[in-house]
C-alpha cells in the first residue's frame, strides 16, 4: 500500500546519527469526542561538544512583532509568522488576527514544532487557504509534524533550498496508526481530502499521505524542499 523509493528513504534515514532520544506525548479530543494521543521520539544529534539539536522543541530566535495572537506573531501589515505549536484555540486566534490586520498576505514558518490538536489544525489550514495567504519557509527553517499541513495550505508556497520538513504517522489512544484502518476509513480519507483541497492531484495526495505514514509515530522522517516539491507545487525558493 505504501511504496516509496528505497533510495529516498535510505538518504533520509542516514542524514545524521542519533546520539540520544527525547520522548514527548500530546493528547487531544476531536469534534466527534474521540480521544487521540501522539507520542514523538525526538533524535538529539551531537554537533559539537556542549551543543545539541532537539527537533521536537522550537529554538527559533525571538520574532520581532507588533502584535501576538496565540501562536501567531504579526511582523507588519502584510506579514505574520507562526512561532509556536497550534492548538484548539488557534483557528480563533487566526481569525482574530485577520480581523485586526486584514492586510496580512504571507505567513512565515521559521521553526514550527506542530500541533496539539489535529482537527483544529486542519481547520486552520483551510482558513489559511480561504484567506488567500501565502506560506514561506525562510533559510534554515524547520517545519515539523502538523505544521507541514499548514505550510501546504498556502495559496503560494515557497521554501528555501535548505528548509527541512519532518513527517510521521499519527497514533490514537489505543495505539492504532493509519495502517490499522482501511485505506477508505474516514480517519485516513480526512487527510487525503485535505491534501486534495490544498491543490494536490489525487495521485500525489495519496502518495504524500503514504510517505508521511512510512515511518511509525515514534520516529521522524526528514524531507527537504526538493522532496516536498515532488508532491506539492512550490514557487521559487525563498530568498532567491
For each of these PLM feature ranges, what is it?
Residues 129-172:
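Glycine-rich beta-to-alpha active-site loop
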Residues 174-240:
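Charged, glycine-interspersed solvent-exposed loop segments at helix/strand-loop junctions
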Residues 6-15:
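Bacterial N-terminal signal peptides
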Residues 91-98, 121-125, 129, 148, ...:
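Extracytoplasmic/secreted envelope proteins and their assembly/folding machinery
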Residues 103-119, 134-140:
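Short, glycine-/small-residue-enriched flexible loop/hinge segments at domain edges that mediate gating
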Residues 27-102, 111-116, 162-203:
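Small-residue-centered hinge/linker elements
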Residues 1-4:
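Positively charged n-region of N-terminal signal peptides that target proteins for export
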Residues 16-20:
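Sec/Tat signal peptide C-region and signal peptidase I cleavage site
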Amino acid at each position: 500500500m505504501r511504496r516509496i523509493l528505497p533510495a529516498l528513504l535510505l538518504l533520509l534515514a542516514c542524514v545524521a546519527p542519533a546520539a540520544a532520544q527525547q520522548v514527548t506525548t500530546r493528547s487531544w479530543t476531536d469534534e466527534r469526542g474521540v480521544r487521540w494521543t501522539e507520542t514523538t521520539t525526538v533524535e538529539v544529534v551531537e554537533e559539537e561538544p556542549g551543543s545539541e539539536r532537539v527537533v521536537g522543541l522550537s529554538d527559533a530566535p525571538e520574532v520581532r512583532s507588533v502584535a501576538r495572537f496565540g501562536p501567531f506573531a504579526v511582523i507588519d501589515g502584510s506579514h505574520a509568522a507562526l512561532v509556536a505549536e497550534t492548538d484548539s484555540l488557534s483557528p480563533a486566534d487566526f481569525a482574530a488576527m485577520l480581523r485586526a490586520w486584514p492586510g496580512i498576505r504571507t505567513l512565515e514558518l521559521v521553526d514550527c514544532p506542530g500541533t496539539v490538536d489535529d482537527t483544529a489544525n486542519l481547520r486552520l489550514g483551510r482558513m489559511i487557504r480561504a484567506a488567500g495567504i501565502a506560506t514561506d519557509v525562510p533559510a534554515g527553517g524547520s517545519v515539523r509534524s502538523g505544521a507541514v499541513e499548514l505550510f501546504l495550505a498556502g495559496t503560494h508556497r515557497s521554501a528555501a533550498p535548505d528548509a527541512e520538513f519532518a513527517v510521521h504517522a499519527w497514533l490514537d489512544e489505543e495505539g492504532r496508526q493509519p495502517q490499522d484502518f482501511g485505506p477508505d476509513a474516514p480517519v485516513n480519507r480526512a487527510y487525503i481530502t485535505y491534501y486534495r483541497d490544498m491543490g494536490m492531484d489525487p495521485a500525489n495526495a495519496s502518495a504524500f499521505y503514504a510517505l508521511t505514514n512510512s515511518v511509525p509515530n515514534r520516529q521522524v522522517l526528514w524531507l527537504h524542499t526538493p522532496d516536498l516539491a515532488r508532491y506539492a507545487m512550490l514557487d521559487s525558493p525563498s530568498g532567491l
